[in-house]
């Protein structure tokens, strides 16, 4: 039933604009001048990775990246639709380009990503300065869409694919520190959490060929990168087989199937100096096999982002999270038993979901007290049009109550983060040096295996090297220390 709902609700027809104004092939593939492209990314890490794919697709067509929008011939905003606030941020940003567009009518402004996919044609109607709209699976079509705009027409493609993974595209790294990079391993989500718009903006789950992933990670290591983060809306459900790209899927077990635990091991074996992270995990899919793989390889970071969303079993059922409070707590115990007590665990939490009571809220606070996350991403509920929650449940928790509950969650998380950091004082951690700290060039920073930021004096440090740091102090969000030798 869940598959049918997702199939019914995801629109896959190509928009009329693409067929009405198809430019000639030579207009697309034979650039005569160089154009400056400016890309701004909002939302999750996946959007950052997607923006790097976009730049790679457009470079052969005469586009060069610029880091200032004032110099741009084309501005792309890669958007998020997970909350209303994210979309309002994009609309506000677009309004700031009005004067720029008036001064330069030839400036092309495009909206990419999840907001583009959700609003489709409506976005062109509501935001008059927008020339181009492209969903997450339409980036290969950007040269054609831009040629359509150049011919004097608006352009839109929000086609959702069942196959697209951009596996053959080598991303051009944007704003890179030269140490850490993202690798997209799968796209889409089949989970259908009742509050979430992602299945409708990114489509069905598709796993990328593992050998292309290993190739990309190997090339990054050879270029000097020392950390890769494997990305997906739900990385633990990664599953690839030789039949993945075929329309007819096998009904019996196949040889050559690669699951997420096996992929982790494949990437970890590239080189012991290449750190591996991954995000994001759904609790139902993080198996013991994954946990034992993390334990087996020193270069797979001992850190798991495991969103709980609520500590109330009743609310979790309404959210369609497929687990309850007791099951989630058992999964946390499994992580600490198998990977180790030092494994960093973070979470996502939503305050004020539909019908949430004070008792439900207290269940969330008590779960936090029991687990004591290293850190969390915390928000109050924002109803998203088209989701199951929007269609089935009343958004009946007053905004003031949502904000108060959220603040209580934030306060508790700050307390726990500080307590956990205090316990690290006196310990020595291996830290991957990322470069100068945000506050001072005298101090440098990096992260330990548990994903904690560590700041230390720069004593002839080099980016991309590992140093041992003795933790001497801390703040709520940062460990402070001195470089030492063991």
Curated annotation (Swiss-Prot):
Domain of life: Bacteria
Cofactor: [4Fe-4S] cluster
Domain TRAM: 422-485
Positions of [4Fe-4S] cluster 1 binding: 44, 80, 114
Sequence ranges assigned to domain MTTase N-terminal in this UniProt record: 35-151
Family, as annotated: Belongs to the methylthiotransferase family. MiaB subfamily.
Quaternary structure and partners: Monomer.
Protein known as: tRNA-2-methylthio-N(6)-dimethylallyladenosine synthase
Native organism: Amoebophilus asiaticus (strain 5a2)
Native organism taxonomy: Bacteria, Pseudomonadati, Bacteroidota, Cytophagia, Cytophagales
